[in-house]
Amino acid sequence: IAAAGNKKFVMIAGPSSSGKTTFSHRLSIQLAAHGMKPHPIAVDNYFIDRHLTPVDEFGEKNFECLEAIDVEQFNKDMLELLEGKRVEMPVFNFKTGTREYKGDFLQLDKDDILVIEGIHGLNDRLSYALPKESKFKIYLSALTQLNIDEHNRIPTTDGRLIRRIVRDARTRGTSAKETIARWPSVRRGEEQNIF
């Protein structure tokens, strides 16, 4: 990425709780070690307000579809950053279900790079306005296998569910019961939008 010199956007994608955020921060450390100035950005901060979120065929809010993201605002902000403009970055408040602006401004210099992570990171419809040559794409998934014994293992999907339960409780004000209840919808969204 550093050697290419023309990349301004590292687009990271993977299923829910696969380690995208952790990876984006670790990658940022490595990019900084190569003289770049990385700025991690979570696509989740571009969610539309919860009451506007589309519903799936089961009547549940579909947070996994691209239509749950304000794609136009995302592209507007990224293009303005690419042009060197100063942009106020949003933060999605998962407790209130609204996007907020708290005075967090970003402006890119020559050596700056955006490390963007979200389940739709590889979807060209998310970043349709960004020049293709400016993007470097990475897919990742949690493949850590846990074995109960020599013959039985815990599926990686179950490991991701456990990671999501912890994350949702810590950062999104969601109970384990709510996260488990949403998991089938999350899995359907992964099948439709990622795999």
Model-derived regions, located:
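Walker A (P-loop) phosphate-binding loop of P-loop NTPases
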Residues: 17
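Hydrophobic anchor at the beta1->P-loop junction of P-loop NTPases
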Residues: 10-12
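Conserved NTP phosphate-binding and transfer environment spanning the P-loop NTPase/kinase superfamily
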Residues: 3-5, 124-195
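Conserved nucleotide-sensing/catalytic segment adjacent to the nucleotide-binding pocket
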Residues: 39-41, 48-97, 113
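Conserved lysine of the Walker
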Residues: 20
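Post-Walker A helix-loop "phosphate-sensing" segment adjacent to the P-loop in P-loop NTPases
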Residues: 29-39
